[in-house]
Regions:
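Trp- and acidic/polar-enriched beta-sheet ligand-binding modules for extracellular glycan
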Residues: 1-99, 108-109, 118-201
């Protein structure tokens, strides 16, 4: 149909690296978007890398709010273009906090954490904390969210500042292998990027 979005479900479960689009007999297409789960074929075992990078296969599992900016943005490489290129939640007037759960690209032992509030000057979170867990069995996203309340602290609640990178060492779970990260922001606000560096195992 003209001037329309067309969605098609694909049942093929194979892994692909290239896509070829054929049109019959001719004509114009504005955009093509292929949605799916990334499968990283490279073996990162023994290497120190950003375990929360989308380039290596990290993915957001759930968050409680993404009113002004999508959660997946904070896994992107490089510096955010603007506030809209980060994760930002709506203003909270209560005592609640906002959170985001990330499945790491690989399981690993965490060495360093970086929270980047680039572009967020009057709407960055006052504080944040990070929890982590190692989940080897396949469970639902809902179960992960419920269980995350009991995850161990990877980073105690720390103060954040506007428009800068915050670097923290892992002093709480040095010898613990993890593959899920939960970032809690107090009470709300925006974060441009999160980078969790660790040795993949």
């Amino acid at each position: 149909k003209p001037n329309s979005h067309h969605f098609f479900n694909i049942k093929n479960k194979s892994i692909f690296t290239h896509i070829k689009l054929n049109i019959y007999p001719d004509g114009g297409i504005a955009r093509i978007r292929i949605y799916g789960s990334m499968k990283i074929l490279k073996n990162f075992t023994g290497k120190v890398l950003n375990l929360t990078s989308v380039l290596y296969g990290a993915t957001p599992i759930a968050c409680n709010n993404e009113h002004f900016g999508r959660a997946e943005n904070i896994l992107a490489p490089g510096i955010g273009k603007n506030m809209g290129d980060g994760w930002e939640t709506r203003r909270s007037r209560g005592k609640n906090f906002d959170w985001l759960i990330i499945k790491c690209a690989a399981a690993g032992k965490i060495k360093k954490i970086q929270i980047d509030t680039h572009h967020f000057k009057g709407n960055y979170p006052d504080k944040c904390s990070i929890q982590a867990a190692l989940i080897n069995k396949k469970i639902s996203g809902k179960a992960i969210v419920n269980n995350s309340k009991k995850w161990k602290l990877l980073l105690n609640k720390v103060k954040l500042r506007a428009h800068q990178k915050h670097n923290f060492k892992n002093n709480l779970m040095k010898d613990k292998k993890v593959n899920y990260i939960k970032i809690n922001i107090f009470p709300d606000g925006g974060i441009s990027r999160i980078r969790v560096f660790g040795k993949a195992e």
